[in-house]
From Swiss-Prot:
Mutations in the RRDR sequence (residues 423-449) confer rifampicin (Rif) resistance. Rif blocks transcription initiation but not elongation. The gene is rpoB. Keywords: Antibiotic resistance, DNA-directed RNA polymerase, Nucleotidyltransferase, Transcription, Transferase. InterPro entries: DNA-dir_RNA_pol_bsu_ext_1_sf, DNA-dir_RNA_pol_bsu_external_1, DNA-dir_RNA_pol_su2, DNA-dir_RNAP_su2_dom, DNA-dir_RNAP_su2_hyb_sf, RNA_pol_bsu_bac, RNA_pol_bsu_CS, RNA_pol_bsu_protrusion. PROSITE patterns: RNA_POL_BETA. This is DNA-directed RNA polymerase subunit beta. Changing H442 to D/L/P/R/Y: Rifampicin (Rif) resistant.
Length: 1169
């Protein structure tokens, strides 16, 4: 079924300078890390795959649960079926129960589902058991419950052929929450408490400014809390015995007018059901249903756990009940009263002492994750509850003898609920496939939005802000910049989700000042109770802290120094607090947080280039991120490569089995980028299990490679790189260094219409042979054809209704006696502004038994690939939030060059660094030069001080080395300065860059040196998805809006540019009266004038006088609607008649010129097709 979902690939452990990747065959990256990580990075997709395996109850999940110590683990589907069972009829004489959910094989492979627009799903079967309680008869059947979407190995779902991701949702955990507010009028501190269930009515208690304790049931009117206690069967004496210590409770009891349980119940009933006649029985039932019946009220396991923990109840006992108990209510009231009276602890009836304090709702101990499994489970629960109603009705209407489980069950509501979730839920999202990192980050995203979460309009600053409890759980850097800032986050590298949905992070246990190798995963609540040291606290070889005072974090994120024996735990890694994308920024510790945020986000926007190149300066995270993203091909077993081609790789495993891996070739991703895999192994080569054997998009030798290493000079250049503009060398254009391939999909279908069937054909009316040159006999463009905007990709004709014939046509009909074919051209054409080469065609036809929507006979898809070279206006960025638009591309000979004649590739402005405080880019530039040139530290006279912390392996490295500088544990400034002075000379024996990282550059135009030395080095530059080709747009004539008669807006509609109020003022200020008149009339909504002008331009005549714009006529109509008599007079006082612009001359002129100046707003569905 679903076993083996996760790529079991282990991470990198750094025991010495060369990263000994536990991924075999990985490229060696020289690492500047000083610390050993005792724990490998967990599977980066586990947050998705583990949750789904819990839902379907896979064997792998079950075994892991048993290993954790669970006796009888229950999967998500089993759990929801157990909740539903048994469904009883209204008399209780019949019942239907469900058990044992299981899956058949999936219907089609992932590739086939993508190709044919199918859903990757497996049939779900359950055992349904019908019991007739009167006769004791039992009927059992296996029932099909619909096709259930399955998760792919990459943690995604294929829904109707598109790849989607279900994002984990951050919500407030069910439980009991105490709050504190200050009354504005009396300035008294007031306290309140909410009991929030997973499902059911809220119960709220509060102390008001008159010092009475009140209760609100299900958000209705407030009542004295003693009314609720009496309704639960408490007498005045019992209340006094339990709460006698509290004046405010005694005061509330005095003000309470109800005398006993019955009166209290009726009082509550009147508040909850005003207008209905109260009876004791109905009041009792109502209260029980509200809080004490599992069908109506569910705290959920996590809610029960939180309530027990907060109030000190049932300590050490397993969680059984999920409803409220009487003791819960009483303990909550006592806790509230003690909190209000300023007490700091209370002892509950079991002898457990609990601290009394206010809760912080933004703390990660009070916020949990609803992962994909739980989100789908909730949706199935909704579908099953709808089905339950149908089953109950059918039990009463059908003949008891003939009833079988199959006749009772209607699976439609369940199937519809699942479909609705995957198709329309805010948390089921179109996967971000711009590059492998964007896909990986999307799967690890945490969203506070969505059903049951926050809305971006109502979310305040507190919930968006970074909280101390986020440490090691949610990245404080990576979040969107817009209105969603702080509401959408990313899971930290080492974080995992526990069975209750709380995020845990690992720590190393410290005992008596000695760091052990024991790893404990702690939730935010548990971490608050401990003292935690940071990962780089100095220790000796035995793990004992070398300093007497150690810097630690305590509750609330406060930092202080304590003695070594007070430390409980220590971080496992310096990169523990950040997400995958943030952990890929070298020298992150030298960047301002705002720019680091942009850097992390912009890495996700990098487009895959024709030739990927891994960064010279990495962080050691590149390999693991690329493998877990799933876009590279990994060998499953150890063996020998038997055969390699561009399309597949065959491995002969050591156990005698042969396995072929198919490679994706030039496939289109969700974002139109090119996903292409290529082998990196040779026939006869030995490979280990887990080794990368083929690269995907944006990877090189299995490492993430989002951009290019370019030789950068940081200097102003003639003002052409002012305001973040970038100057590039023409070499990058000519040699396709920053060239990317983009693939667009164009689709057309042939339907049945009221006038007959549409036809895909080469026989298109009124089209020349030149236009049809690239179409085959079916009317579909050939593969390899170069196409431009307006070219026909697929010829299609649609029948049209009979029209009035002209006398000439009638004469022709009479002579030749044939009825000309009444069809119109509805061919698929290349949209404006697009061009490229046809690389693929897929034809689906009803005749070939392909699944097509109702009414569609044939469907054709054409894939057009575009090779986009870098050009002016494209956006480039580094990894430190340093982004800019290309302002100028210079010939290579004009670029500044080094003393040996090497021209630089890119010039960035110096002003982009100081106020943005992203110094990481400068350090990266220096280290990039060191890595490219190679280095050799002179240790003949002893190791220099600056190199004392470097291991021996780092004393020298050849040219073109790749280095890793992990976040918070990378190369230090002193080491960089020393390495710059130790770089290897070039082949002429010269060192190009000085020890301060600068070089004398020469002007390419004059050959003169620039007056000052310039920082030169290698920086990793990304080409972002904001390409000028997608944005540039021009219009001569085009569609007009039917209503305003003005041109439409936007590139998609082939619209014009808006000339607004302020632009008109600018024209007035310049006195450009005729230009302004032209803009407001013939270029806009003067319907008569624009046709005449077009005619004049075609015939080469002078431009005629403008007419009256349509908007002026609208103004007149508005004034007339206000009962004002408005006349328009010419300059000599003669009245001008305002005619509507639909005269025949206009239409005839337009028809003669072959132009259509009206908006093609489709009149019918057939026209749209």
């Amino acid at each position: 079924m679903l076993e083996g979902c996760i790529l079991a690939v282990s991470s990198q452990s750094k025991s010495n300078a060369i990263t000994n990747n536990s991924v075999p065959g990985a490229p060696n990256r020289v690492s500047f890390a000083k610390l050993r990580e005792p724990l490998e990075v967990p599977g980066l997709l586990d947050v998705q795959t583990d949750s789904f395996e819990w839902l379907v109850g896979s064997d792998r999940w079950r075994q892991a649960a048993i290993d954790r110590g669970e006796e009888n683990p229950v999967g998500g589907l089993e759990e929801v079926l157990a909740e539903l069972s048994p469904i009883e009829d209204f008399s209780g004489s019949m019942s239907l129960s469900f058990s044992d959910p299981r899956f058949d094989e999936v219907k089609a492979s992932v590739d086939e589902c993508k190709d044919k627009d199918m859903t990757y799903a497996a049939p779900l079967f359950v055992t349904a058991e019908f019991i007739n309680n009167n006769t004791g008869e039992i009927k059992s059947q296996t029932v099909f419950m619909g096709d259930f979407p399955m998760m792919t190995e990459k943690g995604t779902f294929i829904i109707n052929g598109t790849e989607r991701v279900v994002v984990s949702q951050l919500v407030r955990s069910p439980g009991v929450y105490f709050d504190e507010t200050i009354d504005k009028s009396t300035e008294k501190t007031l306290h309140s408490v909410k009991v929030i269930p997973g499902r059911g009515a809220w119960l709220e208690f509060d102390v008001d400014k008159r010092d009475t304790v009140g209760v609100r049931i299900d958000r209705k009117r407030r009542q004295p809390v003693t009314v609720l206690l009496k309704a639960l069967g408490w007498t005045n004496e019992q209340i006094v015995e339990r709460f006698g210590f509290s004046e405010i409770m005694m005061g509330t009891l005095e003000k309470d007018t109800t005398s006993g349980t019955d009166e209290a119940l009726l009082d509550i009933y009147r508040k909850l059901r005003p207008g209905e006649p109260p009876t004791k029985e109905s009041a009792q039932t109502l209260l029980e249903n509200l809080f004490f019946k599992e069908k109506r009220y569910d705290l959920a396991r996590v809610g029960r756990y939180k309530v027990n923990k907060k109030l000190g109840l049932n300590a050490g006992k397993p969680i059984t009940s999920s409803t409220l108990t009487e003791e819960d209510v009483v303990a909550t009231i006592e806790y509230l009263v003690r909190l209000h009276e300023g007490q700091t602890s209370m002892t509950v009836p079991g002898g457990v002492e609990v601290p009394v304090e206010v809760d912080d709702i933004d703390h990660f101990g009070n916020r949990r994750l609803r992962t994909v499994g739980e989100l789908i489970q909730n949706q199935i629960r909704v579908g099953l509850s709808r089905m339950e109603r149908v089953v109950r009705e059918r039990m009463t209407t059908q003949d008891v003898e003939a009833i079988t489980p199959q006749t009772l069950i209607n699976i439609r509501p369940v199937v519809a609920a699942i479909k609705e979730f995957f198709g329309t839920s805010q948390l089921s999202q179109f996967m971000d496939q711009n590059n492998p990192l964007s896909g990986l980050t999307h799967k690890r995203r945490l969203s506070a939005l969505g059903p049951g979460g926050l809305s971006r309009e109502r979310a305040g600053l507190e919930v968006r802000d970074v909280h101390p409890s986020h440490y090691g759980r949610m990245c404080p850097i990576e979040t969107p910049e817009g209105p969603n800032i702080g509401l959408i986050g990313s899971l930290s590298v080492y974080a995992r989700v526990n069975p209750f949905g709380f995020i845990e992070t690992p720590y190393r246990k410290v005992e008596n000042g000695v760091v052990t190798d024991q790893i404990d995963y702690l939730t935010a609540d548990e971490e608050d109770r401990h003292v935690v040291a940071q990962a780089n606290s100095p220790t000796d070889e035995n793990g004992r802290f070398t300093e007497d005072r150690v810097m630690v974090r305590k509750k609330g994120g406060e930092v202080e120094f304590v003695s070594a024996d007070q430390v409980d735990y220590m971080d496992v890694s310096p990169r523990q607090m950040v997400s995958v994308a943030t952990a890929m920024i070298p020298f992150l510790e030298h960047d301002d947080a705002n720019r680091a945020l942009m850097g992390a986000n912009m890495q996700r926007q990098a487009v895959p280039l024709v030739r990927s190149e891994a960064p010279l300066v990495g962080t050691g995270m590149e390999l693991r991120a690329a493998i877990d993203a799933g876009d590279v091909v990994v060998a499953d077993k150890t063996g020998v490569i038997e055969e390699v081609s561009a399309d597949y790789i065959t491995v002969m495993a050591d156990d005698g089995t042969r396995q072929s891996y198919r490679l994706r070739k030039f496939a289109r991703s969700n974002h139109g980028t090119c996903a292409n895999q290529r082998p990196i192994v040779d026939a006869g080569q030995r490979v280990e299990a887990g080794q990368v054997i083929a690269d995907g998009p944006c990877t090189q030798n299995g490492e993430m490679a989002l951009g290019k290493n370019l030789l950068v000079a940081i200097m102003p250049w003639e003002g052409h790189n002012y305001e973040d503009a970038i100057i590039l060398s023409n070499r990058l254009v000519e040699e396709d260094v920053l060239t990317s391939i983009h693939i667009e999909e164009h689709e057309i279908d042939a339907r049945d219409t009221k006038l007959g069937a549409e036809e895909i054909t080469r026989d298109i009316p009124n089209v020349s042979d030149e236009v049809l040159a690239d179409l085959d006999e079916r009317g579909i463009v050939r593969i390899g054809a170069e196409v431009r905007d307006g070219d026909i990709l697929v010829g299609k004709v649609t029948p049209k209704g009979e029209t009035e014939l002209t006398p000439e046509e009638r004469l022709l009909r009479a002579i030749f006696g044939e009825k000309a074919r009444e069809v119109r051209d509805t061919s698929l054409k290349v949209p404006h502004g697009e061009s490229g080469k046809v690389i693929g065609i897929r034809v689906f036809s009803r005749e070939d038994d392909d699944e097509l929507p109702a009414g569609v006979n044939e469907l054709v898809r054409v894939y057009v690939a575009q090779k986009r070279k870098i050009s002016d206006g494209d956006k480039l960025a580094g990894r430190h939030g340093n982004k800019g638009v290309i302002g100028k591309i210079l010939p290579v000979e004009d670029m500044p060059f080094l003393p040996d004649g090497t021209p630089v590739d890119i010039i960035l402005n110096t002003h982009g660094v100081p106020r943005r405080m992203n110094i990481g880019q400068i350090l990266e530039t220096h280290l990039g030069w060191v890595a490219k040139a190679g280095w050799n530290i002179d240790v003949a006279a002893g190791v220099p001080d600056w190199a004392s912390k470097l291991p021996e392996e780092l004393y020298s490295a050849p040219a073109d080395s790749t280095v890793a500088t992990p976040v918070f544990d990378g190369a230090q400034e002193g080491e960089l300065a020393g390495l710059l002075g130790s770089t290897l000379p070039n082949r002429d024996g010269e060192v190009m860059v000085d020890a301060d990282g600068k070089s004398t550059l020469f002007d390419g135009r004059s050959g003169e040196p620039f007056p000052y030395p310039v920082t030169v080095g290698y920086m990793y530059i990304l080409k972002l998805h904001h390409l000028v080709d997608d944005k540039i747009h021009a219009r001569s004539t085009g569609p007009y809006s039917m209503i305003t008669q003005q041109p439409l807006g936007g590139k998609a509609q082939f619209g014009g540019q808006r000339f607004g109020e302020m632009e008109c003022w600018a024209m007035q200020a310049y006195g450009a009266a005729y230009t302004l008149q032209e803009l407001l009339t013939i270029k806009s909504d003067d319907t008569v004038g624009r046709v005449k002008v077009y005619e004049a331009i075609v015939k080469g005549e002078n431009i005629p006088e403008p007419g009256i714009p349509e908007s002026f006529k609208v103004l007149l109509k508005e004034l007339q609607s206000l009962c004002l008599n408005v006349e328009v007079l010419s300059s000599d006082g003669a009245a001008i008649e305002m005619r509507d612009g639909d005269d025949e001359d206009l239409e005839r002129a337009a028809a003669n010129l072959g132009i259509n100046l009206s908006r093609n707003e489709s009149a019918s569905v057939e026209d749209l097709a």
